[in-house]
């Protein structure tokens, strides 16, 4: 959530910056500014009424002592009128605050100055490429056919048990999945992240805190009986650990990692890009989260990008890093880097990670602040997170890129975790 004072002081800048996200904020910002002008006017009237009431209250006792009963009674009547006025002002304040809040939560985060203009994925900026795209034999198979051939993943059984987008892993497919999870968690711990095992369902306050609600409510699975939500990412429960907290600046940054199953409705997804593991309703992911000092958050972002890059490098996968344009960024992000790996049989790039700095946007919703010796009052922290990594498309790329006539070669770094070197 944007800072209300920043909007009041810089309405034109907010409107201009949000154009990068293809969001017309002019109406909302104008209404917020007008409402606060009304509030300030009411505040002045309320302050005057309170001052008058305090003055009259002091005079009433004097008037009674001097035997001026009629004047004292008139003064008491005036204080009653003033109390009613103040009550009305307070009610109007509450109504204005509620309306401003409703408007504030509709405004996306402001994009960082380095974010390029653009409408969608085609306008994202490739900032780096790494690894070599493998040359496969002519009859190379896509991962869903390899999964069936080697009995690794049963998509049809998942449909029977639950529905499309809920695959069943088995045999070496399950072991590969578990190997990747453990590898990613070990790498995160080695990078200084504390491991968390969070709940897979969260309440509405948690969903709001990280910005999934109300923006992505239609994409989340909602347990209506208890008003709980299945998490779309471990970012939600892990970041909310710090909700309603004031932390000591010297303890920053906080670094957490978590493995979780993730659940997304992906409403409206269809076509060839959703086949196999390309787009699922339930998938596994390891997440990294940092709570940082505002002065350090972009250094932290670069650190997190390097961490994710090291993972795809160790898996020996061809990859590229993209800086997302304004039109492809999330509601909450100020700057996002996406990682994509190349799927050789499908001949397409697959997103496997997003690493984002949300600056103070989530922290403002979370009421997450820090205190240091230089600030008179607590300040909003910055929050960051990234996928490190999301498994399905990593598995797809490993299966496709490493296929040979003899079988599928397991990346060397995973062999100690898997217990086998090849799927055959």
What are these model-predicted stretches?
Residues 1-134, 148, 152, 156:
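N-terminal alpha-helical targeting/anchoring segments
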Residues 26, 129-424:
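TRNA-recognition modules of translation machinery and tRNA-sensing kinases, especially anticodon-binding
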């Amino acid at each position: 959530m944007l800072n209300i004072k920043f909007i009041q002081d810089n309405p034109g800048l907010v409107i201009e910056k949000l154009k990068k996200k293809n969001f017309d904020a002019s109406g909302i910002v104008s209404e917020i500014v007008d409402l606060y002008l009304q509030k300030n006017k009411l505040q002045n009237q309320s302050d005057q009424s309170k001052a008058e009431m305090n003055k009259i209250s002091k005079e009433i006792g004097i008037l009674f002592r001097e035997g001026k009963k009629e004047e004292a009674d008139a003064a008491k009547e005036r204080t009653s009128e003033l109390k009613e006025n103040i009550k009305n002002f307070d009610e109007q304040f509450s109504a204005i605050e509620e309306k401003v809040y409703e408007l504030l939560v509709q405004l996306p985060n402001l994009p960082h100055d380095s974010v390029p203009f653009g409408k969608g994925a085609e306008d994202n900026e490739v900032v780096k490429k790494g690894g070599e795209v493998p040359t496969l034999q002519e009859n190379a198979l896509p991962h869903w056919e390899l999964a069936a051939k080697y009995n690794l993943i049963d998509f049809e059984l998942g449909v029977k048990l639950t529905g499309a987008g809920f695959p069943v892993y088995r045999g070496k497919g399950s072991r590969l999945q578990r190997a990747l999870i453990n590898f990613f968690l070990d790498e995160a711990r080695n990078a200084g992240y504390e491991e968390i095992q969070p709940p897979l369902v969260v309440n509405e306050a948690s969903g709001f805190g990280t910005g999934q609600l109300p923006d992505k409510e239609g994409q989340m699975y909602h347990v209506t009986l208890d008003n709980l939500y299945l998490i779309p990412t471990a970012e939600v429960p892990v970041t909310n650990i710090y909700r309603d907290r004031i932390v000591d600046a010297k303890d920053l940054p906080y670094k957490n990692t978590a493995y979780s199953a993730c659940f997304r409705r992906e409403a409206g997804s269809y076509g060839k890009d959703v086949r196999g593991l390309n787009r699922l309703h339930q998938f596994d992911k390891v997440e990294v989260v940092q709570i940082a000092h505002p002065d350090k958050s972009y250094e932290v972002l670069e650190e997190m990008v390097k961490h994710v890059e090291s993972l795809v490098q160790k898996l020996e996968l061809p990859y590229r890093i993209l800086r997302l344009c304004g039109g492809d960024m999330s509601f909450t992000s100020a700057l996002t880097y996406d990682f994509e790996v190349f799927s050789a049989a499908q001949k397409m790039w697959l997103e496997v990670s997003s690493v984002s700095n949300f600056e103070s946007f989530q922290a403002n919703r979370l009421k997450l602040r820090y205190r240091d010796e230089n600030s008179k009052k607590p300040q909003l922290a910055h929050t960051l997170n990234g996928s490190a990594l999301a498994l399905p498309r990593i598995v797809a790329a490993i299966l496709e890129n490493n296929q040979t006539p003899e079988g599928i070669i397991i990346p060397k770094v995973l062999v100690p975790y898997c217990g086998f070197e090849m799927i055959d």
